[in-house]
Structure formats: structure tokens, C-alpha cells
Amino acid sequence: MPGPPGSLEMGPLTFRDVAIEFSLEEWQCLDTAQRNLYRKVMFENYRNLVFLGIAVSKPHLITCLEQGKEPWNRKRQEMVAKPPVIYSHFTEDLWPEHSIKDSFQKVILRGYGKCGHENLQLRISCKSVDESKVFKEGYNELNQCLRTTQSKIFQCDKYVKVFHKFSNSNSHKKRNTGKKVFKCKECGKSFCMLSHLTQHIRIHTRENSYKCEECGKVLNWFSELIKHKGIHMGEKPYKCEECGKAFNQSSTLIKHKKIHIEEKPFKCEECGKAFSLFSILSKHKIIHTGDKPYKCDECHKAFNWFATLTNHKRIHTGEKPFKCEECGKDFNQFSNLTKHKKIHTGEKPYKCEECGKAFNQFANLTRHKKIHTGEKSYKCEECGKAFIQSSNLTEHMRIHTGEKPYKCEECGKAFNGCSSLTRHKRIHTRENTYKCEECGKGFTLFSTLTNHKVIHTGEKSYKCDECGNVFNWPATLANHKRIHAREKPYKCEECGKAFNRSSHLTRHKKIHTGEKLYKPEKCDNNFDNT
């Protein structure tokens, strides 16, 4: 039964309600970009209708587009443009001062644009709003993803905010209400816009996914692929005017800028810590809940975040997609490659204000600062020993558990820390990465080179507060201090004897094993017994 004048007649929604048809003359007026946009929009509108179960049979227009045929309508001499789906609140809230018929004409005309041809006509098939048909309920949000109605300015009555798209105005109103009516059948996640749900579904189906030829990574969006390719090229077009740091994405630069202005609007209700981004706050909250929803199928280790799991999986697969162009070394994480590159450039942008020492990584500077403050935040519950870094505590705890997960493939020796294994491997390769500029001597460890340099400088920077004795190296000072403290942390499990140095314990253990401490070298001299 028809409604009263000015009301919307309810009826089933069809593809023709959201489609535009061209005559041959009109189609020829469009350039390549406009034609491609038209094809893209028609396909997307059709997919949305199919997803909602509205489109039963495939329209002739879609068949033409799929076959690569020109979609102009031979039977028509002018374009037919039916209005998009609308709902009654648009009449009340968004178009208070305009006739709806005029608004439709302007929206369609500006959305697809005049191509400059004076003979290109546009006719609205419905002469009044009463003739527009909308589905009775459930699809009032469909208009948000129908791009046939762009570039019309609307105003939200709540916030008096101006929008340049019909869809933006409606989605803004939806955000105000906070409703999430579109639910994913696969994982149950809800969205306030159908277009967002459509995008989300591609994650499950991998539909229209884009693969990187460089490393094989699959991405859901072409724009993401373009951004990702910048990682391989090392391209960083977005530069911070404040500190000069460059980024490969504008969004990363925007996040970075908040460091300088120290804007931290997102606060944790649990501990009061504030963050510049909501996403960082969300990640931080997991610390309090202890939630680790992402589990590795290979070793069953669990992680707080999906990105951490992805990085972890590369340990099992041995995948190292990030390669240094300078020396050819491969890395399983892009961040590790970025850190590594600074070795070649010699760049050390992070300087300690206390002693002037410079570092190539901010994390190293933060770690270094704790030497001056004496802060040791990470304490072992087993023996009470405190550490500057959490990684040091993790490695230390393996002393108590006896766990040695890092094994050398060359000789089978196992270690409790990854760094210890890396150092050990250099024994087999005889790799001396770090060379002394003074005498040319090579070392497998940078710390050993640093210690060695003291021989040339004669510098003794480490002084004992107890007796005033000065030492070249902090390790020597630490060992010396145990004399005053009478501390003997290294205990023999065999007889219980304790030592203040691990080297002394190692030497002592050979007494129990019967191993000779010093093995004489083979002597070729012959002696006469007479």
C-alpha cells in the first residue's frame, strides 16, 4: 500500500537501484581513469548485495564488465541513474533546506562528474522521492559503501561537522551511536559499517590478496603492498622536521611526532601509565592481564601479540627475508636489519648526557643510562640478584633451572643464552669481526676489542671505593670488590666449596674430574740415560 505523500515507499532493493548505465555517446566521453573507477564501483556494489543475500541472479551489466566488454546500453540514449538507498532520517536531518530531488541530481552529477561534454545528459528515473524504493529493514547502512553518491556536502546535526561524501555523513552518525550491526560469521567480530566488514572478510578468504615478489608476503590491500615494497627498497620519504628521522610511511611519522610534543592522551586505568597511541595502550593492557592468546604450533610457546608470534615463527622456518645490501647478511626482522645498517654507516645518533658516550640504538642508550643511576629493575626471586635488563634476568634464571636451549650444530655444546651461542660459533669460523685500528689485532667480540684498547691508552677508569685501587675494566673491579665483601657466589655442587670468581670454580672442578690443570706440550728432545 502506498504511503502518504513525502514518505518513502518500502520495497525490495535491486542491483538497478545502485547501478548507473551509460549510452554510447556518454561512455565515449569518459577517460580511462573514469571508466576504471566505474567498473570498480559497480563490482563493489554488486559484491555487497551478494554478501547480504539481495542479488539473486547476476545482472547483465556485471557479466559485460567481467568479460571486458564496454558496458554502455544500446537501448538507451541517456544515462539512467536511480538514487542510492536512503532512509527517512536523511530527509529530516541531512536535507532540511533542500528538495530531495535536487539533492539527488547534484550528488549523482558530482559523484561521477561532468566530463565537459555539453551533450552528456543526466536524467533521474524517479521523479519524486516517493518512487525511491528501500528495503524495509536491516539494510539502512548499505548506502555507506555505495560510492555512487560522493562529493555532496552534508552537515551532521549533532556536531555540526561538514562532510564531503554522502557515505561519510551517514557513517559519522553511526559512530555517534556506537552501534556495530554488521557481524562477521567467521570470527564474530562486529563493525559499524558494511564496507569495514567487507574489507575484514578478505582476511579470512584471502580474496584479491596481493603478494610481494621480493619476500612472498601476502597482503590484503594493494596500498599495503605498495607500503611494504618500500621496506625492501629502503625508501623513507617521510622525514621528521624536528629530529630529521625518516620513515617509509606517513602514519609512522605521525606517531613519531607525538614523541616530541609528549602528547599522551591514552592512560592505563590499572597503573596510570600514559601513551601517545590507543593501539600501544591496548598492547600495554595485556601486561596486566597476562593474556597470551597467540600460540606457536611448532614449540607451543605463547605470545601477547600476533606480530611477535609471526617474528618467532621465522626461528623455526629459518626464513630471513631482510638482506643487507652492503655485506649480504640476512635478518628475520626488519628492525634487526635497520640496527645492523648503522654498523656500516657508523651512525650513533643517541648520546648520553652524563658521559657523552654515543649509541646507534635508543634501547642501548636507555640500558647504558642505568649504569649511572645504578637502577636494577629486574630481580631474581630465586637468589635475589638484580639486573639492569630483563633479558639478563631471563638468562640468569636458566642457571637455576639448568636449561640450555641454544645448541651449537658444529660441536653440540649448549648454552643458556643466544648471545653466548653466537659468541661461541666464532671459535669455529675463526671470525674476527672487530679489528683494533692501533695494532691491527682482530677480535670475535666488540667488548673484547673495547677491553683491548685500554692496553694502548693505559686508561684505568674503574676505581674501588673501598681501597682506592684502580682497574682497566669493570669486570676486574667487580671481581676485586668481592674481596672486600667476602662474597663467594660460585659454589661447587660436588663438595660445597665456594669461590668469588667463576674461573676459580671451573679450575677447581677439574680436581673432581681428574682432569689435569696444565697439560705439558710434547717435547722432541732426547736425553741420554748414561
From Swiss-Prot:
Keyword Transcription listed? The answer is yes
* Tagged with keyword Ubl conjugation: yes
Recorded GO MF terms = DNA-binding transcription factor activity, RNA polymerase II-specific; RNA polymerase II cis-regulatory region sequence-specific DNA binding; zinc ion binding
Q: What is its main location?
A: nucleus
Please name the SMART domains in this protein's record.
Answer: KRAB, ZnF_C2H2
Q: What keywords does the record list, in alphabetical order?
A: DNA-binding, Isopeptide bond, Metal-binding, Nucleus, Repeat, Transcription, Transcription regulation, Ubl conjugation, Zinc, Zinc-finger
One Pfam family in the UniProt entry: KRAB
Q: Where is this cross-link: Glycyl lysine isopeptide (Lys-Gly) (interchain with G-Cter in SUMO2)?
A: 264
Biological processes per GO annotation: regulation of DNA-templated transcription
List all disulphide bridges recorded for this chain.
none
- Provide GO CC annotations from the record: nucleus
Matching CDD domains: KRAB_A-box
The record, for InterPro entries, names: KRAB, KRAB_dom_sf, Znf_C2H2_sf, Znf_C2H2_type
Per UniProt, subcellular location reads as: Nucleus
Domain KRAB: from-to ranges: 13-84
- List residue spans of C2H2-type Zn fingers: 182-204, 210-232, 238-260, 266-288, 294-316, 322-344, 350-372, 378-400, 406-428, 434-456, 462-484, 490-512
User: Family per UniProt?
Assistant: Belongs to the krueppel C2H2-type zinc-finger protein family.
What the protein does comes down to: May be involved in transcriptional regulation.
Kindly provide the name given to this protein in its UniProt entry.
Answer: Zinc finger protein 680
Encoding gene (name): ZNF680
